């Protein structure tokens, strides 16, 4: 019945039933009181669709609260898919996606480090065709927090459980979206978040958890998956991209026998060290983008961590306002892919990852008026917003994601694995290899996919609704580098069309 309020043409009987439901429930399917965002500092004019934001408490006893920001679809929010977006890290805020990738606005720097950015409508926002939920997860990330600091010791499985609890409570708050198709999407370390959360959602559906979520599938971009596939992807990628010579590649291939990330043989170790030195000057998030190299590296404090001053230089993307100077998701050094046990914070591995800064997002999200407008706790209450935090003690305890992908797709849940083909952080070579390893038959042979008459990448379709796709010229965060192409494959895939 809540659907009827979104569209004209309701029958008199339906309208009467709606009024009765509203009278009995005190609001029916409406969003929770006080959740609507009516305006945003830095943006002039009416919002292009309804926005909502706030907290969902996933543990009352500990006061563990997850922050969300919802952007209703600009097309038909009553029917369009609902998509939960998760950034990676672990420990990185999903406002990364909102500000720098596929949110409703393009952010233009205000001119100085702390000045309020100007917001302009993004013609390639994913909210053009879907309702987006941006979730900061787990607690301690972005604007999410807990009153019990022990909650900041967490891992894959606990994060998935909390995120599932969030979803069940969120759909209770927004029941008008229960019949919409629901998808989970993310990038980088969300290559772990997405399948583990999808597994929890499916398990909940099968176990009778209420409300019943209309889960249809998931999306993973340049995502972490498996220690062996991820760890061995970089050397073939570097060779294919012309970063290392045939001779160097053959030396590594012969001495390492394909096991590049866990070199134990002396000759293999020498070969890998040579490759590391050759690629060390590149922007790992997009090998085409520039990096600043200073003769003397100065150190700057960020919270309780130290980062080289060289992380402050500007790269370029296809965004109209090139305000992003930090490409941050998760940069795994060649010999340190995700494996069982504690995952180092991004600050601990950052010394090998140049080209970093996030002043625009920080200036906006730490502005008192913005915090008030989006119903977030103040800086004085929960601290400043950080793109990626180091307060978590995070454990990778879910193992390889291959079994998760196999289980989900074999049950009929659609999936697309997409990769920016110039990302050296999580190279497409690894994603393509593990996708093939699932053993599904090919139903749409490898071919280019087209946007505006131009090749935008390559794709291959498999049985059980599985699709693999590359995005030509894109880096680690695909919608940031190639917003138009990203919107094209996203909208086509959601609609069930071929890329």
UniProtKB/Swiss-Prot annotation:
InterPro entries: AB_hydrolase_fold, Peptidase_S10, Ser_caboxypep_his_AS, Ser_caboxypep_ser_AS
Keywords from the named record: Carboxypeptidase, Disulfide bond, Glycoprotein, Hydrolase, Protease, Secreted, Signal, Zymogen
Protein origin, superkingdom: Eukaryota
Record has Secreted as a keyword: yes
Modifications after synthesis and translation: The linker peptide is endoproteolytically excised during enzyme maturation.
Pfam families: Peptidase_S10
GO molecular function: acyltransferase activity, transferring groups other than amino-acyl groups; serine-type carboxypeptidase activity
Residues cleaved off as propeptide: 297-351
Location of the motif Microbody targeting signal: 497-499
Gene Ontology cellular component list: extracellular region
Positions annotated as glycosylated: 148, 262, 407
A Gene Ontology biological process term: proteolysis
Reactions this protein catalyses: Release of a C-terminal amino acid with broad specificity
Active-site annotation: 188, 423, 476
Keyword Repeat: no
Major localization class: secreted
Signal sequence, renumbered to the chain: 1-30
Subunit field text: Carboxypeptidase I is a dimer, where each monomer is composed of two chains linked by disulfide bonds.
Function: May be involved in the degradation of small peptides (2-5 residues) or in the degradation of storage proteins in the embryo.
Name of the protein in its database record: Serine carboxypeptidase 1
């Amino acid at each position: 019945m809540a659907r009827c309020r979104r569209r004209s043409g309701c029958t008199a009987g339906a309208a009467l039933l709606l009024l009765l439901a509203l009278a009995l429930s005190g609001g029916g399917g409406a969003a929770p009181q006080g959740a609507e965002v009516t305006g945003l500092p830095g943006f002039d004019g009416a919002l292009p669709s309804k926005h909502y934001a706030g907290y969902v408490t996933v543990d009352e006893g500990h006061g563990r609260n997850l922050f969300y920001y919802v952007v209703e679809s600009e097309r038909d929010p009553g029917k369009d898919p609902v998509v939960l977006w998760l950034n990676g890290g672990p420990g990185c805020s999903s406002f990364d996606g909102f500000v720098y990738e596929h949110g409703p606005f393009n952010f233009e720097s205000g001119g100085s480090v702390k000045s309020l950015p100007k917001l302009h409508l993004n013609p390639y926002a994913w909210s053009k065709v879907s309702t987006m939920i941006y979730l900061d997860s787990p607690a301690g990330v972005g604007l999410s927090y807990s009153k019990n600091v022990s909650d900041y010791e967490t891992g894959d499985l606990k994060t998935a459980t909390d995120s599932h609890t969030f979803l069940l409570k969120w759909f209770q708050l927004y029941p008008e979206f229960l019949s919409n198709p629901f998808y989970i999407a993310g990038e980088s370390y969300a290559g772990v978040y997405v399948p583990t959360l999808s597994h929890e959602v499916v398990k909940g559906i099968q176990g009778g958890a209420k409300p019943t979520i209309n889960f249809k599938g998931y999306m993973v971009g340049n995502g972490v998956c498996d220690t062996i596939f991820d760890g061995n992807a970089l050397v073939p990628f570097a060779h294919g991209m012309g970063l290392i010579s045939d001779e160097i590649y053959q030396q590594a291939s012969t001495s390492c026998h394909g096991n590049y990330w866990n070199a134990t043989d002396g000759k293999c170790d020498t070969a890998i060290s040579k490759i590391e030195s050759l690629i060390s000057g590149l922007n790992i998030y997009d090998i085409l983008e520039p990096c600043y190299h200073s003769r003397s590296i100065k150190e700057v404090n960020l919270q309780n961590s130290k980062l080289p001053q060289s992380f402050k230089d500007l790269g370029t993307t296809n965004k109209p306002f090139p305000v992003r100077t930090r490409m941050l998701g998760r940069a795994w050094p060649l010999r340190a892919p995700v494996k069982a046990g504690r995952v180092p914070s991004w600050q601990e591995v950052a010394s090998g990852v140049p080209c970093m800064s996030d002043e625009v997002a920080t200036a906006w999200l730490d502005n008192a008026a913005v915090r008030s407008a989006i119903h977030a706790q103040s800086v004085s209450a929960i601290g400043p917003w950080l793109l990626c935090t180091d307060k978590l003690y995070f454990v990778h305890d879910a193992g390889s994601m291959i079994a998760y992908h196999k289980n989900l797709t074999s049950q009929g849940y659609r999936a697309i694995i997409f990769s920016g083909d110039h990302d050296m952080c999580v190279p497409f070579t690894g994603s393509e290899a593990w996708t093939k390893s699932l053993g599904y038959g090919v139903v749409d042979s490898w071919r280019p996919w087209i946007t505006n008459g131009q090749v935008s990448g390559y794709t291959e379709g498999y049985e059980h609704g599985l699709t693999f796709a590359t995005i030509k010229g894109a880096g680690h965060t695909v919608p940031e580098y190639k917003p138009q192409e990203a919107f094209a494959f996203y909208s086509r895939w959601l609609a069930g069309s071929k890329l």
